[in-house]
Amino acid sequence: MTVGIIIQTRTGSTRLPAKVMMRADDEFLMIDYIINQLQHSKLSNKMVIATTDLDQDNVIYEHVTNRNIPCFRGDEKNVLQRHYECAKKYSFSTIVRIPSDKPLIDPTIVDNAIEKFQSSSYDYISNFSVNVDNEHEFLPSFPSGTEVEIF
């Protein structure tokens, strides 16, 4: 079983454009914090950045490939297709999806989720849920910023 972490990212955010490329401190960008944290996962085999094929996201591609992190590029609007094509390209049998706006992601939480997924017969697990009763409600079971999905 090949477990791949896919960090989905883009610069086209409407609330805070290019936030992942903002400087977090004197040494690192926001995306670097996520990468650095997830490199400590003991149960994943590979990490890939998945961004769009838009020119504005060339900056993400250049930055992460300079760090020797693979970068997959795909359609901006169809995020699920981007994940599918990325997983297919890298032969992932299990996808760990991490949004790029989670710089404090805990690799222990990620590994615990991978372990739970591997020991179950579930097709999908996450450490948060969305309740649909005429509105969408985020129901975190872990602190904000530590969300992980596996499928």
Set out the residue ranges of the language-model regions.
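Short phosphate-binding loop-to-helix
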Residues: D53-S120
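Short beta-strand/turn micro-motifs composed of small residues
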Residues: T9, T51-D53
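N-terminal nucleotide-binding beta1-loop-alpha1 segment
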Residues: M1-P17
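Conserved acidic residues
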Residues: V3, N45, S93, D123
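A short, N-terminal amphipathic alpha-helix
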Residues: L29-M47, N66-R67
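Conserved core of the sugar-phosphate nucleotidyltransferase
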Residues: I105-F151
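Short glycine-enriched, charge-decorated loop/helix-capping segments at active-site entrances
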Residues: V20-D25
